[in-house]
């Protein structure tokens, strides 16, 4: 039996920083209004001509270097994005070619919006456990600045661009309860709520790219409930209590959602990794970005139990319990 171990982690943020004050020059808002409602101070926007694949490749190169793995060893790429370079081919194929990964190995995109990285991680984990891959790149990358409506102050202030990636390595499972790797993943969706968070465009509907639309109050209500339940599901599946978790790495949607979920679970807020202030909501990139930052600054250490969780449009939501 194979187990997927996170061997390396990497991230990338575009150089262009956009502060709340910058946005206040473009839309009717203030720095105080954004801070109080979201916790966001700054976000990064991709430069003109900088594509999702460029962000993804930068994060992937950093992850490969961190893992000490050559790109030629990668035999699977799963890329989570809601903002692909093109309708097709998959952005993952451009990443595969750009990195010099092995031709012929599978590379594909997954679209579950802000839950996308957890969906991608779960799929890659399943393929490794099935013996169909040995070294996988799992990437979350977004250029959400391209689909924002800068006349809608309730949404355009929330999002940023970025990418995060992890390298998964197949490792023989010993059956030891303390071994490293992905211990469990849980995925969910409820399409009845697809019209609460969506983009009002698409090739088969309007023939346009469209802009992001969101009913924020309803999304908040569902997010706290769904994330609470999926965390309990992960704990129950592994026979654990909440105090066994060393760190929670949530999707960075809004500081209020992070705080509300932690309070409902009875988890110490100090155990919750928050990068929302400096990254904003980067959709599928937010979980790996936060994971990599906390690992890089020394908060997350080898052997610790890490709970990843996210919810996105659809609705989609999920969790992954990992021992690093």
Curated annotation (Swiss-Prot):
Location (main, coarse): cytoplasm
Protein name: Beta-ketoacyl-[acyl-carrier-protein] synthase III
Keyword Manganese: no
Catalyzed reaction equations: malonyl-[ACP] + acetyl-CoA + H(+) = 3-oxobutanoyl-[ACP] + CO2 + CoA
Origin superkingdom: Bacteria
Key words, A-Z: Acyltransferase, Cytoplasm, Fatty acid biosynthesis, Fatty acid metabolism, Lipid biosynthesis, Lipid metabolism, Multifunctional enzyme, Transferase
Pfam families associated with the record: ACP_syn_III, ACP_syn_III_C
Any single Gene Ontology cellular-component annotation: cytoplasm
Region: ACP-binding, residue numbers: 252-256
Reported function: Catalyzes the condensation reaction of fatty acid synthesis by the addition to an acyl acceptor of two carbons from malonyl-ACP. Catalyzes the first condensation reaction which initiates fatty acid synthesis and may therefore play a role in governing the total rate of fatty acid production. Possesses both acetoacetyl-ACP synthase and acetyl transacylase activities. Its substrate specificity determines the biosynthesis of branched-chain and/or straight-chain of fatty acids.
Subunit comment: Homodimer.
Signal peptide extent: none
Active-site annotation: 114, 251, 281
Gene Ontology molecular function: any one: 3-oxoacyl-[acyl-carrier-protein] synthase activity
EC number assigned by the record: 2.3.1.180
Record remark on domains: The last Arg residue of the ACP-binding site is essential for the weak association between ACP/AcpP and FabH.
Entry annotated with the keyword tRNA-binding: no
Family stated for the protein in its record: Belongs to the thiolase-like superfamily. FabH family.
Pathway(s) it belongs to: Lipid metabolism; fatty acid biosynthesis
UniProt subcellular location: Cytoplasm
